[in-house]
Regions:
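Conserved HGGG/HGGXW glycine-rich cap/lid loop of the alpha/beta-hydrolase fold
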Residues: 6-63
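Conserved loop-alpha-helix segment in the C-terminal half of the alpha/beta-hydrolase fold
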Residues: 208-248
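Alpha/beta-hydrolase active-site loop signature
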Residues: 30, 55-59, 98, 123, ...
Length: 270
């Protein structure tokens, strides 16, 4: 099982295949490098050097007691890229993974990067004056606090989010597999990550992005992100390109894999 041990002693798991331009994949919260990209990894590896990483306390990576933060995951990413001698990579992040990407740029700039792929990302979860794109279309700070309180009482709110991640629900056995995958992240770690996500605000970072950037958003029954945040982000990131997946919800990589794989591979190689 390939891992990179980062400075605090935590082993970070990765999987790698293929040759060509480097494409690094960061999946969403509580999901894994082995399970998340089941419809994508092998197809992308036909034309790219693909590397998928388990965030700390996810999947096969180490499960330290804490603390857990987006910033720590960003620093872990930097150590993995250096250890694998990755340079000029296209870095693709989904949801939480995209937050890790934006935090990486805050802390490390464009080091080892050539392109960004922002997939189903939120840059501020909660409501704010003038902010038209909160999670669920309306997510007051009080709701965030209530969600965290509920998570401390029961695991159910953490794993329940998967039901709203698809425009068309997957088969029951697939949903069960994803639920089991999510259970690999300890509850305490997941709560710390969610707390950090709720506090995060990356809106001002977008205007500073100076790499070619692809934006991918689903538009079918997208419960977490019902608004046109993709169009807004396209206006914030100079020269970015938006791909709207009309037949997918919050999971275009799973619901429209052929188009997703083709779009990502062409962008990485272009």
């Amino acid at each position: 099982m390939p891992t990179i041990t980062v400075k605090d002693g935590t082993p970070i798991y990765y999987r790698e295949a293929g040759q060509g331009p480097a494409l690094v994949l960061l999946q969403g919260l509580m999901l894994t490098a082995d399970g998340f990209w089941t419809k994508n990894f092998d197809a992308l590896a036909r034309s790219c050097r693909v590397i998928a990483i388990d965030h700390r306390s996810h999947g096969r990576s180490g499960k330290p007691l804490g603390p857990h933060s987006i910033a720590q995951c960003a620093d872990d990413l930097g150590e993995v890229l250096a250890a694998l001698d990755v340079d000029k990579a296209a870095l693709a992040g989904v949801a939480f993974g995209a937050m890790v990407m934006l935090e990486y740029r805050r802390r490390h700039g464009n080091r080892r990067l050539a392109k960004l792929v922002i997939i189903e990302a939120q840059v501020r979860l909660t409501n704010a004056p003038g902010w038209e794109h909160p999670t669920f279309g309306n997510f007051p700070a009080e709701a965030g606090a209530g969600f965290l309180a509920a998570c401390r009482q029961s695991r159910e709110p953490l794993t329940g989010f998967l039901a709203g991640a698809f425009g068309t629900p997957p088969p029951a056995d697939e949903m069960a597999r994803m639920q089991l995958e999510a259970w690999q992240t300890p509850t305490a770690a997941a709560i710390e990550f969610v707390e950090d996500m709720i506090a995060a605000d990356y809106r001002a970072d977008l205007a500073k992005v100076d790499l070619p950037t692809l934006l991918i958003y689903g538009r079918k029954n997208n419960v977490p992100i019902p608004s046109e945040i993709g169009r807004w982000m396209q206006g914030e990131i100079r020269g970015s390109h938006l791909e709207r997946f009309e037949d997918s919800g919050h999971s275009p990589f799973y619901e429209s894999p052929e188009r997703f794989n083709r779009t990502l591979a062409e962008f990485a190689a272009g």
